[in-house]
UniProtKB/Swiss-Prot annotation:
Cross-referenced Gene3D superfamilies: Mu homology domain, subdomain B
Annotated region (Interaction with DPF motifs-containing proteins), positions in chain: 537-543, 569-571, 643-646, 789-794
UniProt function note: May function in clathrin-mediated endocytosis. Has both a membrane binding/tubulating activity and the ability to recruit proteins essential to the formation of functional clathrin-coated pits. Has a preference for membranes enriched in phosphatidylserine and phosphoinositides and is required for the endocytosis of the transferrin receptor. May also bind tubulin. May play a role in the regulation of energy homeostasis.
Name the UniProt record assigns to this protein: SH3-containing GRB2-like protein 3-interacting protein 1
Broad class of the protein's primary localization: membrane
Keywords linked to the UniProt accession: Coated pit, Endocytosis, Membrane, Phosphoprotein
Compositionally biased spans, kind Pro residues: 221-236, 322-346, 433-451
Gene Ontology molecular function terms on file: microtubule binding; phospholipid binding
The organism of origin for this protein: Pongo abelii (Sumatran orangutan)
Length: 804
């Protein structure tokens, strides 16, 4: 391109005049270069319009030569070998520009800025160009072909030639974001009837009113249930609908098979004994709460003979507390952390039993329980008559601070202290940096009066304290005395009680924080310091048990039964609150994914429901508050040291889909020979069985081996063999999607026998899981007056067997 350039004489960049009528615009800021209108650089005086003529333009806006239209095609914009003087003598143009008409002048007033903008439309020379900051670069058309760049343009303003980028069409991006969020509960199924036969196995009822299996018993049996809260317009008027509840005769198809397995009777030391028909019938007597002398919480200090039989010897600190679900009643699995209580079959996640005198039973408090799941709405003002006192320290703070509550003098606003405590200085809630609590002396478990117990600004789970947002209350803080909670201005005086064991026994989760409570104190139940208009904390727990029987490797022969229960937990101080507020708001809740349940047995003395609801996916229940208050009062009298009261609300059976509903698929293969036995166990983690994929914890595989085992030739992975009990045990900490091969594995073993061949025995598997359920059910409150401080979900293996 540069080879054709001649030595510059009076033209800039060697541009020929026949290719460009006007002077070069490549370097407009250089001195000595003329403007296209003949004026020197920087001169913007009156323009001589007679020098211009309106040329004829083609369809692209280019000027057409008068003598040789289109003669520029095929030409080049660089100089040829001929001199410019010779070419100029051959090619001379006389150009006249017509003056603009008046109407055109009105439309396009030739201002200096518009002239500068119009110059930008002229095609640039390929020569290196330095742009001037006074020249607008935005009007240059960049998407021109090489031919278009070579063709010259006139400097006449032509606004229609300016390239304009069309705006982006935002509607075209809509498919990138996908369809709108669909409802999580689209699947509509037929509403499950409540009047189903009882699914917990047949047995002799202890209630005389339940002797007839077809007896129709309306509930509640006590005071007529109150109407739902008036401040819930969406809730229709309810009527106490009768519910047919009675023990049924339905039995599982594997009852005969499972109970005919004599080789499992010697597994008591690990998983507890197999429930015989007699024990199942005895356990079936454990029905709903009823206001008799025996508390449903089972506070007897000693185990009855029945409890001694059912209690698993290997897990005394993890009792179960739900009735046996028929012939597949689960032995007590390794339950969640909680103090021991009377054993049932499914451990309750919020066990309220008293703490025994073992330190090992209280080692469950770990950092993995410190999860903040509070909702921002919990920190709102709500319907508070008076701002509540500051919260107690959190889990990490309590361990090294004087106690799980604020000091005796800690308060929010001016008000009289509790009658049982002297008045002490108050700590304004607007203070952002209160003094930290003093360290806890090892020989002084109580906080001296007058010293604040809150103020650790680095607490990990405490919300910011502002004057416009009252701090949350301490629902389960131990008080220094058993003062009444009727005063709305009473100050929190929670301190650490004198206990024999320094290890905390219970953890209460409320408003995004964990509070430690203590058993064994002589100060009575923990008061619930709050006003009459404050919301009461309630905890809910779903506990489900999966019972499965696998036959060989055939999925069609898998039998599954899933049972569950929903428990509500109330703080002990709620009894005093009810005593001072005899007409509390009705507790109403809604169970979500109700259509996945086959049989539902509400507590007939405490729960009412509306069977006329249209939505089969949800079910609304409300509590008979007079019966609940009577029940909690009786429990508090029988268990004055209890911190929480668990009340069974629902028992249900989950709709199972065969092997697809089992969280862990199993297949066992035996090869028995006179001198040796080969055993292979295949397992597979099944995420489809859970609503949320969670790990299976503490997985144990137990197999009895007979035939006189003399040697273990190969065991993969390593296992523990008990020669006396003739069994082999594999322990896997957890199985999940993150495990090797996505939770798919095998267990292999070969045994040398002296009294062979061996007889194949059923495989027994145990596991627990936290954070999800197999039914996918959830719960939410309806109306005001209460709040959920914790919703816990878990499931465990009951009778989880696999045979050859």
């Amino acid at each position: 391109m540069m080879e054709g350039l001649k030595k510059r004489t009076r033209k800039a960049f060697g541009i020929r005049k026949k290719e460009k009528d006007t002077d070069s615009t490549g370097s407009p800021d250089r001195d000595g270069i003329k403007k296209s209108n003949g004026a020197p650089n920087g001169f913007y005086a009156e323009i001589d319009w007679e020098r211009y003529n309106s040329p004829e333009l083609d369809e692209e806006g280019y000027s057409i030569r008068p003598e040789e239209p289109g003669s520029t095609k095929g030409k080049h914009f660089y100089s040829s070998s001929e001199s410019e003087e010779e070419e100029e003598s051959h090619k001379k143009f006389n150009i006249k520009i017509k003056p603009l008409q008046s109407k055109d002048i009105l439309k396009n007033a030739a201002t200096v800025d518009e002239l500068k903008a119009s110059i930008g439309n002229i095609a640039l020379s390929p020569s290196p160009v330095r742009k001037s900051p006074r020249r607008s670069p935005g009007a240059i058309k960049w998407n021109l072909s090489s031919e278009e760049v070579a063709r010259p343009r006139r400097s006449t303003p032509t606004p229609e030639l300016i390239s304009k980028k069309p705006p982006d069409d935002t509607t075209a991006l809509a498919p990138l974001f996908g369809p709108p969020l669909e409802s999580a509960f689209d699947e509509q199924k037929t509403e499950v009837l409540l009047d189903q036969p009882e699914i917990w196995g047949s047995g002799q009822p202890i209630n005389p009113s339940m002797e007839s299996p077809k007896l129709t018993r309306p509930f509640p049996t006590g005071t007529p249930p109150p109407l739902p809260p008036k401040n819930v317009p969406a809730t229709p008027p309810r009527t106490g609908s009768p519910l047919t509840i009675g023990p049924g005769n339905d039995q599982s198809a594997t009852e005969v098979k499972i109970e005919k397995l004599p080789s499992i009777n010697d597994l008591d030391s690990i998983f507890g004994p197999v429930l015989s028909p007699k024990s199942v019938a005895v356990n079936a007597e454990e029905k709903w709460v009823h206001f008799s002398d025996t508390s449903p919480e089972h506070v007897t200090p000693e185990l009855t003979p029945r409890e001694k039989v059912v209690s698993p010897p290997a897990t005394p600190d993890n009792p179960a507390d739900s009735p046996a679900p028929g012939p597949l009643g689960p032995p007590g699995p390794t339950g969640p952390p909680g103090p021991p209580g009377p054993p049932r079959n499914v451990p309750s996640p919020l066990n309220l039993e008293e703490v025994q005198k073992k330190v090992a039973e209280q080692t469950f408090i770990k950092d993995d329980y410190l999860e903040t799941i509070s909702s921002p709405k919990d920190f709102g003002l709500g319907q508070r008559a008076t701002p509540p006192p500051p919260p107690p320290p959190t889990y990490r703070t309590v361990v090294s601070s004087p106690g799980p509550g604020s000091g005796p003098g800690t308060g929010t606003t001016s008000g009289a202290s509790s009658p049982a405590r002297p008045a002490t200085p108050l700590l304004p809630c607007s203070s952002t940096t209160p003094p930290p609590p003093p360290p806890r002396p090892p020989s002084r478990p109580k906080l001296p009066p007058g010293k604040p117990g809150v103020g650790d600004v680095s607490r990990p789970f405490s919300p910011p304290i502002h004057s416009s947002s009252p701090p949350p209350i301490a629902p389960l803080a131990r008080a220094e005395s058993t003062s009444s909670i009727s005063s709305t201005n009473s100050l929190s005086a929670a301190t650490t009680p004198t206990v024999e064991n320094e290890q905390p026994s219970l953890v209460w989760f409320d408003r995004g924080k964990f509070y430690l409570t203590f058993e064994g104190s002589s100060r009575g139940p923990s008061p619930l310091t709050m006003g009459a208009q404050d919301t009461l904390p309630v905890a809910a727990a779903f506990t489900e048990t999966v019972n499965a029987y696998f036959k060989g490797a055939d999925p069609s022969k898998c039998i599954v039964k899933i049972t569950g229960e929903m428990v509500l937990s109330f703080p002990a101080g709620i009894t005093r609150h009810f005593a001072n507020n005899p007409s509390p708001a009705a507790l109403t809740f809604r169970v979500i994914n109700f259509s996945r349940l086959e049989h539902v047995l509400p507590n007939p003395q405490l729960l009412c429901c509306d069977n006329t609801q249209n939505d089969a996916n949800t079910k609304e229940f409300w509590v008979n508050m007079p019966n609940l208050m009577t029940h909690l009062k009786k429990v508090s009298e029988q268990k004055p040291q209890a911190t929480y009261y668990n009340v069974d609300m629902l028992k249900y059976q989950v709709s199972a889909q065969g092997i697809q509903s089992t969280p862990l698929n199993l297949a066992v293969n035996w090869r028995c020979e006179p001198s040796s036995t080969d055993l292979r166990i295949d397992y597979k983690y099944n995420t489809d069985a859970m609503t949320t994929a969670v790990a299976l914890n503490n997985v144990q595989f137990l197999v009895p081996i007979d035939g006189g085992v003399t040697k273990l030739q190969a065991v993969l992975p390593p296992a523990v063999r008990n020669a006396e009990q003739q069994r082999i045990l594999w322990k896997i900490p957890d199985i999940s999607q993150k495990s090797e091969n996505g939770g798919v594995g095998s267990l292999l073993a070969r045994f040398q026998l002296s009294e062979g061949p061996s007889k194949p025995s059923p495989l027994v598997v145990q596991f627990t899981s936290e954070g999800s359920t197999l039914s996918g059910c959830d719960i939410e409150l309806v109306g005001a007056g209460y709040r959920f401080s914790l919703i816990k979900k878990r499931f465990a293996a009951g009778k989880y067997l696999a045979d050859n």
